[in-house]
């Protein structure tokens, strides 16, 4: 399948900003779920909790067959049947604190197409 990358270029540079608050309730639920796997020196807010913050919300009926939010909201409308997380790098600059407001800024930095064993793949790099 050929992907028209030119039609996806308008998404380059698109930014999404979301905020969330590190509530004691969220931290308690995270600790209860991952108790045995948490690093003892994590402090008041355990490492990894950032995956539970600033989540996208979409009505269940609007989710795609792959369980993701509809394409074309933040991510470009890539004409392929499924999406997956390909990897990331996380740097902890300072410890998070209970009650802190956390801001996530995501920017689409690059869109590339490659041929894999299963066919065409499109990689959307989000910074």
Task: Show the residue positions of the predicted features.
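Hydrophobic beta-sheet segments that form the core/acyl-binding groove
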Residues: 83-127
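Hydrophobic, proline/glycine-rich low-complexity stretches
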Residues: 1-101
């Amino acid at each position: 399948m050929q992907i028209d990358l030119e039609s996806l270029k308008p998404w380059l540079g698109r930014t999404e900003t979301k905020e969330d608050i590190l509530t004691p309730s969220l931290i308690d639920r995270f600790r209860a779920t991952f108790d045995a796997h948490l690093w003892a020196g994590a402090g008041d807010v355990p490492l990894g909790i950032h995956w539970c913050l600033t989540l996208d919300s979409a009505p269940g009926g609007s989710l795609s067959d792959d369980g993701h939010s509809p394409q074309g909201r933040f991510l470009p409308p890539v004409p392929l049947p499924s999406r997956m997380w390909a990897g990331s790098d996380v740097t902890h600059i300072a410890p998070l604190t209970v009650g802190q407001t956390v801001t996530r800024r995501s920017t689409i930095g690059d869109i590339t197409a490659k041929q894999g064993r299963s066919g065409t793949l499109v990689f959307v790099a989000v910074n």
